[in-house]
Amino acid sequence: MPGYNAHRIFNYAIFAAIAALAWHESVNPKQLLALGIGFYIGTDFLTPDLDTESTAIKRLGRLKILFLPYKWTFTHRQSSHNIVYGAVVRILYISIIMLVLYYVLFKSFPSGTVFFSAYIILFLVGIIIANALHVLLDVIF
């Protein structure tokens, strides 16, 4: 099974190709940036390996305590290594943590209109693509 750096190199090489193609096709730079930020977060922070003592979890320092329930719930290389499901679960998990943090800080939940812009969708797609590439590399090796 490839290590943390092998996953990062593979993911970023693929993203460089995606970015070059997108730039060549005159994709909006802001949209490419949204995809790239999601891809970065999906590669370096919300990896399928958050359920092990991986480099990704160690990089979080004391914040890794937030992922203990995730680690206890998911067995490594099972549902967390599903191409779409794993990324969606991690996105929902971190969203719940952010919502609780917001509530603790402001004593209320966010109000106002919930919106889905193209940038949010591209950000989430970036996370899902990074997750899919991680799983693909694990399957190959």
Task: Please tell me what each predicted stretch does.
Residues M1-F141:
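N-terminal membrane-targeting hydrophobic helices
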